[in-house]
Design a protein with these regions (language model features):
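Short, conserved sequence motifs used for protein processing/export or organelle targeting and
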Residues: 1-136
């Protein structure tokens, strides 16, 4: 990410033979991240390697065609990846984005047909009071 944003790993533990990593993503800018236009997105690309450097887990890889591994919206605009508090499988990816819905509740990319958000988990600016912001 560019300036104005922070991310990292707070803690890594092994719990019942499973690797757990507590990561953080913080928006230090003065607006939501990504910004207004609904096609913009920010996602976590996580790779775990073993002691020999072999990849044992990956979530959110960018494919050569620009699509994100695990994001159903790239293949079918009527679907989208939900917000995840935990990533447990490589077909899950944490994507921060807004998804618009039309009057029938279907996902749409048409600004003139959109009447609400179906998903809006964009990162709020640092210092913004989250209790006053409703998550969709």
């Amino acid at each position: 990410m560019g300036r104005g944003h922070a991310f990292g790993v707070r803690e890594v533990t092994i719990n019942e033979g499973r690797l757990e990593a507590d990561v953080f993503v913080e928006n230090l800018g003065g607006h939501k991240l990504p910004t207004a236009y609904p096609s913009r997105r920010v996602w976590l690309h996580v790779t775990v390697r073993d002691g020999a450097g072999r990849k044992v887990f990956e979530s959110g890889a960018l494919r050569p065609d620009g699509s994100i591994q695990g994001n159903p919206n790239d293949a079918d605009p009527a679907t989208f990846e939900p917000h995840h508090d935990e990533i447990r499988a490589n077909n899950q990816v944490q994507i921060y984005e807004s998804i618009l819905g039309d009057a029938n509740g279907a996902a749409t990319t048409g600004l003139l047909t959109a009447v609400r958000y179906l998903k809006d988990n964009r990162l709020l600016p640092h210092g913004f009071e989250k209790r006053s912001e409703e998550r969709v």
